[in-house]
């Protein structure tokens, strides 16, 4: 942590394909709620936004990028789980999502995950939603890609019946679909989003947790939300940091 502050630069992994949370803009820099959280943390280290190196980090490479030191932290719709805690350390959560489903607007036979039996269900390799479907809904035909955007065209052309990931991610795709897609049913899991850092860097984790508690209280967290995901989604409840 001190080395980052002294260097005045930081490398942050985030998604480049998720509207509202992490999406590459035409200007060549990512935008979204995760990106704003990353900027706040960097800023509190004394690092200007222009000295952040953003690295595209998909679900399958979040842990490898942290372990190898390719990134200093990951802010990428990254669900905290006990299994992942064995590999990386998590600060947060800074947002609580839930797994949901997205279909074509014309689909009317999928409303709960129990309806997925025999359906082609698209998700992403290395993701919590994919693991949940494989474990709890084995009669679904799971189709895995490297990124959620890779699921969109198969959904359009009928190769898959449904896309599943966190509700807020799907909301971003629906918002950009001009009525083509819809989110169906209610969230059926709890997905607390955390900030991933190196497993042994407990000092950095604790410091980020302090930053999160601070921005929950001073309004910067809510402002970051309202400027990004909050354009489409309602204001969320303030999470409680898990100082495990």
Please annotate each region the language model reported:
Residues 95-103, 171-212, 231-244:
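Periplasmic-binding protein-like
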């Amino acid at each position: 942590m001190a080395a980052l502050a002294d260097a005045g630069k930081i490398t942050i992994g985030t998604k480049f394909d998720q509207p509202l949370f992490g999406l590459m803009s035409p200007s060549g820099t990512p935008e979204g709620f995760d990106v704003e959280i990353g900027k706040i943390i960097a800023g509190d280290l004394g690092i200007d936004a222009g000295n952040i190196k953003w690295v595209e980090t998909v679900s399958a490479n979040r842990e490898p990028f942290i372990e190898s030191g390719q990134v200093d932290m990951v802010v990428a719709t990254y669900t905290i789980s006990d299994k992942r805690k064995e590999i990386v350390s998590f600060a947060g959560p800074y947002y609580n999502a839930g797994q949901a489903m997205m279909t074509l607007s014309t689909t009317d036979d999928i409303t709960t995950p129990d309806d997925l039996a025999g359906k082609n269900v698209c998700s992403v390799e290395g993701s919590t939603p994919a693991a949940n479907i494989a474990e709890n809904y084995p009669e679904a035909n799971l189709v895995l890609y490297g990124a959620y955007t890779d699921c969109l065209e198969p959904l359009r052309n009928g190769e898959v019946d449904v896309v599943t990931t966190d509700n807020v991610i799907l909301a971003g795709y629906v918002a950009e679909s001009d009525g083509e897609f819809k989110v169906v049913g209610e969230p059926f899991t709890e997905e607390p989003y955390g900030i991933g850092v190196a497993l042994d860097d407990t000092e950095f984790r604790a410091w980020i947790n302090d930053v999160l508690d601070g921005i929950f209280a001073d309004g910067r967290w809510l402002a970051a939300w309202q400027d990004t995901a909050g354009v489409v989604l309602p204001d969320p409840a303030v999470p409680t940091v898990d100082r495990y």
